[in-house]
Amino acid sequence: MAAMASLVQDVWLGWDPRLRALRLAPFDEPRVRLVFHLDAGATLDDGRLATFLEAMAERLEVIAWEPRGQGASGGRFGPEVLDDARRLVTEGAARWGSLPLVVGGHGLGGWLALALANAPGVAAAFALAPSLAGAGEEPSAPLRAALVNAFARPCVPVPTLVLEGRERPAAEAEAVSQWLRRDPRGSRLVAGGTDADLLLPPWPATVAAWAEAIGSAAGEHAL
């Protein structure tokens, strides 16, 4: 039986603007760190999300954060969230120690995670029901354009996983198909039900096991 999360710690990222995060970890020493990106409009106080993060933290150290303009984080939501996400991935080891790093996210946060899959030190990335709905309706919307620019790069060099519900908008499913056509190491898992169901068992434990296995293997390879 996996150890339950024994650490749940509010964290403030002392940037400009100041951002709120949550750090969770199991009782046993974690082998992998997960930086998790929330969906547009979501906060760390959401009950279903909190339960999901607790389940992930049975295996992993989890750093989840509220983008600027959401929840208790300062600033205004916009294209800068991509830079914030990249900074968190880059500076995490200096703040919390060195561990193999996996990035993940839900909804818009899923696309943020995939956009960071080629960042230095990232061992793998996953996206739960990735959605561009919160990035603006028009292709020229600043955040949507920033994500397009982030994806205009060579193929991702690490394993990626997209998990989505069977009952989802056709445009969102097609965006995933386009991503996978350019990502030779990408995998897709379609679950029964809706995208909202992906925060419920058995998916937190399933994704955590995947992240731990991939991250641990990358850490051993780096030794």
Regions found by a protein language model. Give the residues of each.
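N-terminal cap/lid segment of alpha/beta-hydrolase-fold proteins
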Residues: 1-26
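The serine-hydrolase catalytic nucleophile loop
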Residues: 40-53
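Conserved alpha/beta-hydrolase
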Residues: 56-72
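Alpha/beta-hydrolase active-site loop
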Residues: 76-95
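Gly/Ala-rich beta-loop-alpha elbow adjacent to hydrolase catalytic centers
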Residues: 105-109, 113
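Active-site nucleophile loop of the alpha/beta-hydrolase fold
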Residues: 127-135
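The feature captures the conserved acid-bearing segment of alpha/beta-hydrolase catalytic domains
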Residues: 135-181
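Catalytic histidine-centered segment of alpha/beta-hydrolase-like enzymes
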Residues: 194-204
